[in-house]
Amino acid sequence: MRCTGADLPTDSGNLVVRAIERLAEVAGRNAGVDVELHKRIPVAAGLGGGSSDAASALLAVDELWNLAWSREALARLGAEIGSDVPLFFSMPSALVTGRGERVEPTRLAWRGWIVLVSAKLEVLTDRVYAMWRPSDRDPGVEAVPSGLLTAATADELAGYLHNGLQAAVQRAYPDMGCLLEEVGRRSERGAWISGAGSTVYVPCDSAEEAARLADRLRGMGSTATVRTVRTLDETMHNH
């Protein structure tokens, strides 16, 4: 395995290698695979980069070896590798519960753009979980807010966004709290930390709105990397 774009392990310390090794074991294959990973999603950013890499590897090797496994079977195997891996077999959107192994494909009414602001630091999940407190739960947040699925605009969507690990991330990494505050101050609707990672995000309804916000954020003097991305739909994901 070779990797460009990030300094990552290329042995079993990488989810891609572990996923392929596990698939080979279960499928009874002894053939090797030459893997070249072009890393574009920031590492430890709370964006599921490693998990999506593992899922992509399983899909690619399944095709390479003519295994013809179902996506459900690959997702179950992926759950052995990492809790977030099964999600990426039910794209573009899904409701995920339990440890991550229960995945229900769903459809969000909202489609738009998201501005991502990634700090240049590695946020360790174990450290974040160690800083989590029961009081971080928001009793006003439904397990699956129905409005999250039906929100038609970014403003409506923002009213339902919640990250139960956001406070823990800020306690573990105070610089993330500062970044969250800076981005929120320049946004028209607030900002949120993605997962247990180093990325703050803001939803926008159009490419123009996202570009304006990205320009403002790039001018705030931070070393963070600012990107704009578009939400996936079924057609885009299939490609």
Kindly give the residue locations of the regions a language model identified.
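N-terminal beta-alpha supersecondary unit
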Residues: M1-A44, R230-H237
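Short, basic/glycine-rich phosphate-binding loops at helix/coil junctions
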Residues: M1-P9, A57, A79, T153-H162
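DPxDG-like acidic metal-binding loop motif
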Residues: V16, A45-R71, L87
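Phosphate-handling active-site elements
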Residues: E25-E36, A60-I81, S206-G219
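Conserved, helical-rich catalytic subdomain that frames metal- and/or nucleotide-binding sites
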Residues: F89-G190, D205-H239
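Conserved glycine-rich beta-strand-loop-beta hairpin in the small C-terminal domain of fold type I
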Residues: S198-T199
